[in-house]
A protein has these predicted regions:
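Metal/cofactor- and membrane transport-associated sequence elements
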Residues: 1-113
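Short acidic, Gly/Ser-rich segments with clustered Asp/Glu that frequently serve as metal-coordination loops
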Residues: 3-10, 90-91, 254-262, 333-335
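Structured nucleic-acid-interacting core domains from mobile-element enzymes and related host factors
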Residues: 226-252, 319-321
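C-terminal reverse transcriptase regions that engage the nucleic-acid substrate
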Residues: 40, 88, 116-236, 372, ...
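Alpha-helical coiled-coil heptad-repeat oligomerization segments
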Residues: 59, 99-110, 174, 191, ...
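RNase H-like nuclease module associated with reverse transcription
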Residues: 122, 247, 281-391
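Mobile genetic element proteins and their domesticated derivatives, centered on retroelements
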Residues: 2, 18, 42, 54, ...
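RNase H-like nuclease fold core
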Residues: 189, 250-293
Length: 391
């Protein structure tokens, strides 16, 4: 559902005055100004005023704001659970009872001028396909537009988004290129990662050279575009699980000093709900890790923070507590360090914030488990893989 002229519904808490608009100036009061009662588009207060108005309306209808995600509102329990996701003036409604959904729509129509856009097919650039088997998310049209804008439509495709063992540097001696053009392309690719975890590492890697890009960096970006050209239909499929309840399962991994400029490692985090990927993350670590154990431990802590938040959000959506989150790690030393303070001489310098995982393991919220390197699914988020491992 879409709210028409949403910002005009916001009620101002501050005194705001505006000049009389041309064509509506009161004769004899030309030098007077108008006192606004409601918000107008262009006011700094308008977005906040609209959000406060919508929040008030949803709370009045019996909804509760999610403590984990403030853009999500919840009503009812179990089979009568109604979930409303909010993005500015767009509302996504999900529930197991059609009567409850229709009732909510009627109540919203009586409160605001609304447009009912029907079943969700397209949202913020994401194409949504729903069936009895599940839901598929992709960005085919958006990806095709990127190729068209960059002049790469119909280019020769590649099997992987980045060459294995490729190492780029900020100190590249290759000819410089227009930074604005480079940033525009990479920024577009960053949004595509929302439904393409296979692009997370490569896009994150080329994002490190936004300040002074060269033709060498642009070549890596074009490689990503060539890969996209051959995988336009790729996206995320979420299968409906009918028998048992889907469990939250996470994977964390890291490379070792992969950034040749700073020698910092890259963290890769991937979470599944059942067999469905729900969140992924590839980012350069904040500190230089002195060992593979430390790099893996930092990555595991990052995954723990994400897993705790996901478990809390899922608990709210389901209306019941989620069990312990399993976290798969392919480094035995990091697992041992998460369970007890071993290797003191080699780990005593690690920042205290990275020891948060120990508390979560101790109180049972997270279970760290060993997994083989070849089975580590988060590996794709930490380095450029060869074709046989990437596919």
């Amino acid at each position: 559902m879409d709210v028409k002229s949403a910002f005009l519904n916001g009620e101002l808490q501050e005194d705001v005055y505006v000049e009389q608009p041309p064509g509506f100036i009161l004769r004899g009061h030309e030098r007077k100004v108008l006192h606004l009662v409601k918000a107008l588009y262009g006011l700094r207060q308008a977005p906040r005023a609209w959000y406060a108005k919508l929040d008030e309306s949803l709370l009045r209808l019996g909804f509760q704001m999610s403590t984990s995600e403030h853009a999500v509102y919840l009503h009812g329990a179990r089979d009568r659970r109604l979930v409303v996701g909010v993005y500015v003036d767009d509302l996504i409604i999900a529930g197991g009872n059609q009567v409850d959904i229709d009732t909510f729509k009627q109540e919203m129509h009586s409160t605001f001028k609304m447009s009912d856009l029907g079943r969700l097919h397209y949202y913020l650039g994401l194409e949504v396909s729903q069936s009895e088997e599940g839901i598929t998310l992709c960005q085919n049209a958006y990806a095709a537009k990127i190729l068209e804008t960059t002049g790469m439509t119909g280019c020769k495709s590649t099997c992987t988004p980045m060459e294995p063992r490729l190492k780029l540097s900020k100190l590249s001696t290759a000819p410089a290129i227009d930074p604005t053009h480079y940033r525009s392309i990479v920024g577009s690719l960053q949004y595509l990662v929302n439904t393409r975890p296979d692009l997370a590492y490569s896009v994150g890697y080329v994002s490190r050279f936004m300040e002074s890009p060269t033709t060498e960096h642009l070549g890596a970006v074009k490689r990503i575009l060539r890969y996209i050209s051959g995988t336009l239909s790729y996206g995320c499929q979420y299968q409906r699980k009918k028998k048992e309840e889907a469990r939250l399962l996470g994977y964390s991994d890291s490379d070792q000093a992969g950034d040749i400029d700073t020698r910092k490692s890259t963290t890769g985090v991937l979470f599944f709900l059942g067999n469905n990927p729900v969140t992924w993350q590839s980012q350069k670590q904040k500190v230089v890790a002195l060992s593979s154990c430390e790099a893996e431990y930092i990555a595991a802590t990052t995954a723990t923070c994400q897993g705790i938040w996901l478990a809390r959000l899922i608990s709210e959506l389901r209306g019941r507590e989620a069990g312990a989150t399993s976290l798969k790690i392919d480094n035995e030393s990091a697992i041992a360090l998460s369970k007890n303070p071993v290797f003191h001489d080699r780990s005593k310098h690690i920042d205290v914030r990275y020891h948060f995982i120990r508390e979560c393991v101790e109180d049972g919220r997270v279970k760290t488990e060993s997994i083989g390197t070849t089975e580590q699914l988060a590996d794709i988020l930490t380095k450029a893989l060869a074709r046989d491992r990437f596919c």
